[in-house]
Design a protein with these regions (language model features):
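Sec-dependent bacterial lipoprotein signal peptides
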Residues: 1-30
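Short, intrinsically disordered, charge-biased short linear motifs at domain edges
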Residues: 15-16, 37-43, 63-65
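Bacterial Sec signal peptide processing site at the extreme N-terminus
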Residues: 24-49
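Catalytic cores and adjacent binding grooves of peptidoglycan-active enzymes
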Residues: 33-37, 81, 152, 157-228
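Second-shell loop/turn segments in exported
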Residues: 40, 99-109, 176-184
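Active-site acidic/histidine clusters and adjacent loop/turn architecture
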Residues: 50-133
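Active-site-adjacent substructure of cysteine-protease-like catalytic cores
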Residues: 124-158
Length: 228
């Protein structure tokens, strides 16, 4: 082998070796015509450790509204071994439609968020109890913001939840899309919910972030911190 070819191989494989020392980096679907399946995913041990700790602590107990489901796997690093299907929050008092598929550590945070942020905001601004959340998205194996070549979304790990509408006992409802720039009451409710959500999730994104989030609040427990 010539010295030129030897040096060329070093240049090609050295970056890959560096990636392997910091964690497995997977490129998935680079030739796919579907941008959702064209993403970069990194094997991060903390995810498995966090899930195991949640399960060992019995932080989530199956009920009529929180049920265990079969493992979600692939492609690439999508999924979780011990997902739960959540159809209501805060002890069953607030329904979630459609149901959400989430990993174990998300469930207690959603419960606390509903009980400690959304329900108090509903009583304060709406004067009626919260009864239902409209789930725009939970588990979905896709790239961030549906952009080809982006990182795997936290939705791909069942580690994110999107909420588009809040419904109340008096029959009224506030959608994120219509209410963010809606009446004073709607704006006040949604902004109090948005700001409070940042205490419970690492990343919270709404209409103020970009057009992709104009109609929902995104909340996740990923490694990046943002409240926008």
């Amino acid at each position: 082998m010539s010295s030129y070819m030897y040096l060329r191989r070093i240049r090609v494989f050295a970056p890959l070796a560096a990636l392997m020392t910091s964690g497995l980096l997977l490129l998935w679907g680079c030739s796919s015509s579907n941008p959702d399946l064209d993403f970069v995913a990194k094997d991060e041990p903390w995810r498995k450790q966090e899930e195991n700790a949640c399960l060992s602590a019995n932080a989530v107990r199956p009920t009529s509204f929180i049920q265990t489901r079969s493992a979600l796997g692939g492609p690439s690093l999508c999924g979780t071994e011990h997902p739960f299907e959540m159809s209501a929050a805060d002890g069953g008092r607030v329904s979630m439609k459609p149901t959400a598929l989430l990993r174990c550590p998300m469930i207690p945070q959603v419960d606390r968020w509903v009980a400690e942020v959304v329900e108090p905001a509903a009583r304060h601004h709406i004067g009626a109890p919260l009864t239902e959340l409209t789930v725009a998205a939970s588990y979905a194996c896709r790239s961030m913001n549906h952009v080809a070549g982006a990182r795997l979304s936290e939705h791909g790990y069942a580690n994110a939840l999107d909420i588009s509408v809040f419904k109340f006992a008096d029959g009224s409802a506030i959608s994120v899309k219509g209410g963010w720039y809606g009446s004073g009451r709607e704006r006040a409710f949604l902004r109090e919910v948005h700001d409070g959500t940042c205490r419970y999730f690492t990343t919270v994104l709404g209409p103020g972030y970009n057009a992709a989030h104009r109609d929902h609040l995104h909340l996740d427990r990923g490694p990046y911190r943002a409240c926008r």
